[in-house]
């Protein structure tokens, strides 16, 4: 009887020990923060979140309303990475704010376009028409090049990726260029004759570059939206896992099915 009791106790200890070993081998999910602005970035990260969860990475998606705050959060280490901008915009931030941000890879492109509630064709705009454009220099330069391609203006030779209205050499159509914060462009859209709107804000306003744009950026490849980190974190396994998920099959399929008009397309 005593022997049976000892044996039972021993078995109990062995079971407890085995349970403890199993518990110790369970991998705890690691939380990592990534900052975004809005559509489509937040939705793409939700898809990526499901993918990296399989690798025990818990993605904490933090939405911001300001470009600069997003980059400053990465610089401070509040979040590990952000996903909202293209390389020229990132370079502009680094230059103006003594930043040290780098891109770890292209994800998608969002063509810039000229929209109007009043006119249906570029040729319809009269002299004196007011056209709103983004006021941050990287996107302002994109807008100016688009307006140049559409015949509204001519830019000074060599004006580059950070051109401003000061680089307009000739106002061919005598339009008024009104600089507006990118996030506010959809709001002022009804108050001006036309507006050159960033892809993500156009989407939020229910606009499609291919369907509604009077002039559409022909090649947005230089402005692919990228995943950004502070220099030194490029090889972080969590960053690379998120990048793979954002460039993976599920995200590419979503983009093709959700944005059939090409408003957002996977980067090549």
Swiss-Prot record:
This entry carries the following GO cellular component terms, namely: plasma membrane
Does the UniProt entry include the keyword Lipoprotein?
Answer: yes
| Protein topology in the membrane | Lipid-anchor
Lipidated residues (N-palmitoyl cysteine): 24
| Keywords noted in UniProt | Cell membrane, Lipoprotein, Membrane, Palmitate, Signal
- Localization (cell): Cell membrane
Pfam families annotated for this entry? Answer: Lipoprotein_9 (PF03180)
**Family of the protein in this entry:** Belongs to the NlpA lipoprotein family.
Protein name as it appears in the record:
Membrane lipoprotein TpN32
Q: Which organism is it from?
A: Treponema pallidum (strain Nichols)
């Amino acid at each position: 009887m005593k022997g049976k009791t000892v044996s039972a106790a021993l078995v109990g200890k062995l079971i407890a020990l085995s349970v403890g070993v199993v518990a110790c081998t369970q991998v705890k999910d690691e939380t990592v923060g990534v900052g975004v602005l809005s559509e489509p970035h937040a939705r793409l990260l939700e898809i990526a979140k499901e993918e990296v969860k399989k690798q025990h990475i818990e993605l904490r998606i933090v939405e911001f309303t300001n470009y600069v705050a997003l980059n400053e959060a990465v610089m401070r280490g509040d979040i590990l990475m952000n996903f909202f901008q293209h390389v020229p915009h990132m370079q502009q931030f680094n230059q103006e704010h003594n930043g040290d941000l780098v891109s770890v890879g292209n994800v998608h492109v969002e063509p810039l376009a000229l929209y109007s509630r009043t006119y249906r064709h570029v040729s319809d705009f009269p002299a004196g028409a007011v056209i709103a454009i983004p006021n941050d220099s990287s996107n302002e330069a994109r807008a100016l090049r688009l307006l140049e391609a559409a015949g509204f203006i001519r830019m000074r030779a060599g004006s580059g990726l950070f051109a401003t209205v000061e680089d307009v050499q000739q106002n061919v159509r005598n339009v008024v260029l009104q600089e507006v914060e990118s996030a506010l462009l959809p709001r002022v859209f009804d108050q001006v004759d036309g507006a050159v709107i960033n892809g993500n804000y156009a989407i939020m306003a229910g606009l499609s570059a291919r369907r509604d744009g009077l002039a559409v950026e022909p090649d947005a490849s230089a402005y692919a939206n990228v995943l950004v980190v502070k220099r030194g974190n490029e090889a972080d396994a969590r960053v690379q896992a998120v990048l793979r998920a954002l460039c993976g099959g599920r995200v590419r399929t979503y983009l093709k099915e959700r944005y059939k008009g090409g408003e957002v397309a996977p980067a090549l």
